[in-house]
Amino acid sequence: MKPIRFSKHALGYITSRGFAVAEVEEAIRTCAWSPAELGRLDCRKNFACGLTWNGKVYATKQVRPVFVEEAEEIVVITVYTYYF
């Protein structure tokens, strides 16, 4: 499998969006990829978390990386997280 590299943009949102690099890598390596806007790809993976986020407890965190597959690597452009 190709190495995964994170853009500066994606890395800049780790804290504010509440995802871990390992979660994103797991999503890309284990979930089905779907076409996304601008010729990019995305995928989604749910993680059980029981996390308090912005003062509310959530049972599930969904991580949705948006990325491109290049010849030698996968580049993560951004990562969205959803809590429910």
Regions from the PLM with identified roles:
Residues 1-84:
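Ribonuclease/tRNase effector modules and their secretory precursors
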